[in-house]
C-alpha cells in the first residue's frame, strides 16, 4: 500500500483514538438542597425564579445610562474580553497539533570555483513534507480538551466581570446619591441650628436665656459644619469611584430623588433550590477549570504509552528548471517513528501525580465557590427582613422625634425646660434622619447583592 493511501486511514484511526482521562462526574453540592426563606418578597412556590435582565431590574433611567456607559468604557471588562480572545487562540494552537502538518519547500543553488575556469553548477529542488502524530492514547486530544475548557472558563470569567461591573456601578451610583442626601440633611440641620442660635441670642438680650445656652447653640453649629465638610469629602470620593467604574471623566449625575422604586424587588419561590447557583458564572468557570484538570490527567496517563509519528515527503531535484518536475527527477520517502518510554527517573509518574493533585484542588475550589455563593444568597435573604424591620422602626422613631422636638421648642419658649432639652431633640432628629438614609441605602445594596448572587446582571 502506498503512503498516500495509508495516510488517510492513519488519520481516521488517530482522531478516533481512545482517551485515558477519567470519566467526568460533577461533584455533589456541599450545601443544603434549598434555601431557608422568610415570607418577604416571595412568589408562589410553583413559580420558578428567572433572573430579570438588568434593564428590567433597575427602574431608574440614570442607573441604566451609567451601566451602559460602563459596559462600553470600563477597562476591567476590556481586559476580560482580551483574555477570552487569548484563550481562544491558545485553544486553536493546541488543537492544531491533532491534525497533519503539510509544508512545501523549494531551493536553488549556484556554485563554481574562484578562478572561473569551470562552468557554474546549478541545482534546483522542490518538495512537499507531511507529518502526523498518531494519537492512539488520547494525549493530544486531552491536551486540546483541556485548552478548550480553559477557553470556556475565561468566557465565564468575562461574564463574572460583566455582572460585577453592573452591580458595582449601581451600588456606586446609590452611594453617590446617599452622599448627596447626607450632605443635604447636614446643610438643612445647620440652617435649623443657626435659627435656634439667633432665637437664643435674642432671648439672651431680653434676659430670658443665659450665656451657657448660647454657647451650646454655637457648639452644635460648629459640629454640624464639621459634619458638612466630612460629607463633602465623602461625595468627592463617591464621584471618583463612579468615574473609575465608568471609565470616563464626563459629567456625573447630580442629586436625584432615589427611593425603593429605583429597582425591582427580587421575588423568589418559597422552595428555592440551591441548584440555581450553578448558573452563576464564577461557579461555571470553576467547573470548566475542573474539567480541564480532568483532561490533563488523561494527557499525563498517555505519556506512559508509546507515541507514534509518521513523516512522509516527495521531492524533485534538477540542474535545469525546465526538467525540475520530470518524473525521472523525483523521489518519495515514508518514515514511521515510535518512541517508547523506558526510563525517565519517575518524570511521567510525577507529572501524573501533579495532574491528579491539581484535579483534586479544582474539586475543592469548585466546592468552595458553591459554598461562598450559598452564603452570599443566604446572607442577603437574612438581611432583607432585618433591614425592612429596622427601617419601619426608624420611621416610627423619626415621627416621634419630630413631635418631641416641636414640644421641646414650645416648652423652652415658655421657660418650662432648658435649651439642653431642645438641643438633645435636635441632635437625635439629625442622627435618626442620617441613620434612616443609611438603612435605605443598605436595603438597596442588599437587593442588588441578592440579584447578583443569583447570577443576575448578564442579560439586558
UniProtKB/Swiss-Prot annotation:
One of its GO terms (biological process) is monoatomic ion transport. Keywords: Cell outer membrane, Ion transport, Lipoprotein, Membrane, Palmitate, Porin, Signal, Transmembrane, Transmembrane beta strand, Transport. This is Cation efflux system protein CusC. One of its GO terms (molecular function) is efflux transmembrane transporter activity. A lipid is attached at residue 18 (S-diacylglycerol cysteine). One of its GO terms (cellular component) is pore complex. The keyword Acetylation does not apply. Belongs to the outer membrane factor (OMF) (TC 1.B.17) family. It is found in: Cell outer membrane. It is a multi-pass membrane protein; Lipid-anchor. Forms pores that allow passive diffusion of cations across the outer membrane. Part of a cation efflux system that mediates resistance to copper and silver. InterPro entries: OMF, OMP_efflux, RND_efflux_OM_lipoprot_NodT. Homotrimer. Component of the cus efflux system composed of CusA, CusB, CusC and CusF. It comes from Escherichia coli O6:H1 (strain CFT073 / ATCC 700928 / UPEC).
